């Protein structure tokens, strides 16, 4: 929500063209120290993200009107966020609003497809899958500070809006 409010100002500092190259720089010592302090906790955080992602999958898998990630056997996904495709855009808007009102930071992730942001020589209707994702994708938090109550609140909101 904070990002959405500050987006007009932040957009002034964003690139408006694809990058031509990537510059590798040395990290400041503060970042090195911070990284060394946090790195030992990484495995715990990855495990919690994995657990929360699987829990959301099981809480939402029986709802119609949703498409969830395909979880293959013998694969250990460590979710950055949990992606959900919601077929009905009006329901997506209501779900997003209710989640935000409940204090659950969800996001559309892609405001628009890349070929709409930059003049890359493509037509607006090109890349139909990217266009669909931009209109129907909602991502849910799975970070280590998401608790079982948050996950159940997410399920309740989806249930109330999709029944």
Question: Which ranges hold each PLM region?
Answer:
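PLP-dependent aminotransferase class I/II
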Residues: 1-163
